[in-house]
Amino acid sequence: MSWLEKILEKSNLVSSRKASIPEGVWTKCTSCEQVLYHAELERNLEVCPKCNHHMRMKARRRLETFLDEGERVELGTELEPQDKLKFKDSKRYKERISAAQKSSGEKDALIVMQGELLGMPLVACAFEFSFMGGSMGSVVGARFVKAVEAAIENNCALVCFSASGGARMQEALMSLMQMAKTSAALERLSDKGLPFISVLTDPTMGGVSASLAMLGDINIGEPKALIGFAGRRVIEQTVREDLPEGFQRSEFLLEHGAIDMIVDRREMRQRVGGLVAKLTNHKSPMVVSVNESPNEEPYSVPEADEKG
């Protein structure tokens, strides 16, 4: 065997070994680009163990890892989107719905589950960003109202994880109406004295950020989540000024008082559970103290001046 044949044989052996690695074993961090073992990333709740970047998470997995194991009831499964306007852009809306359902495995962009959090009854919902950018249409609005009604019926708190590009343009005014519809539903929840905790994940934009996502009794942001109404470029072109570094990120919003706290996804169950326990006066042995970590500065309220 010649030296060239030996090299080619080794090359074929290496390539065959590479080909034998199953697909989906490795994934790359979207921030630091570190190659990660996918099973380890899943155990870490889609948070990069190298740089702590919070990657986007599937709505169903988010709810399943957030709520207690055991009986969970999914609400609003009978609701499916309809093309009432016969809308068409480069594609028919009906075709877009079918494609989104096939790629995401969900019927629409919001999943609602009723279950328990640290032994306390709770209704939780989460946006599925892979379904047409988590856009809010009639079904999303109707499912959110069902979540509110279930919380009222069971006299428990409501938690929502938002990840959306805004209102769904293919449903025109019907999608914009969901902003008022969801806001009115939350008003009914508030009238009953029940808490609504809104968790804003990356990204939360447009009509969702301008309605239900910012109406929480407590608004929580995930680290470095993009949160806002219009996009950065649109704002810069409108005001004709450069925006500050980190504009529309959760850290910027916390600094300027737009959200109440930033919570690492891996601590979300305990932190939200502690808040729910306090807001509902529920004593659960599974709830631990939610005091700030030693690295966090305590919040202080400035004294009012003489003018009040």
Swiss-Prot record:
Its main location: cytoplasm. Pfam families: Carboxyl_trans (PF01039), Zn_ribbon_ACC (PF17848). It catalyses: N(6)-carboxybiotinyl-L-lysyl-[protein] + acetyl-CoA = N(6)-biotinyl-L-lysyl-[protein] + malonyl-CoA. GO terms for biological process: fatty acid biosynthetic process; malonyl-CoA biosynthetic process. Keywords: ATP-binding, Cytoplasm, Fatty acid biosynthesis, Fatty acid metabolism, Lipid biosynthesis, Lipid metabolism, Metal-binding, Nucleotide-binding, Transferase, Zinc, Zinc-finger. Signal peptide: none annotated. It is found in: Cytoplasm. GO terms for molecular function: acetyl-CoA carboxylase activity; ATP binding; carboxyl- or carbamoyltransferase activity; zinc ion binding. The keyword ATP-binding applies. Disulfide bonds: none annotated. One of its GO terms (cellular component) is acetate CoA-transferase complex. A zinc finger (C4-type) spans 29-51. Its EC number is 2.1.3.15. Component of the acetyl coenzyme A carboxylase (ACC) complex. Biotin carboxylase (BC) catalyzes the carboxylation of biotin on its carrier protein (BCCP) and then the CO(2) group is transferred by the transcarboxylase to acetyl-CoA to form malonyl-CoA. This is Acetyl-coenzyme A carboxylase carboxyl transferase subunit beta 1. It comes from Vibrio campbellii (strain ATCC BAA-1116).
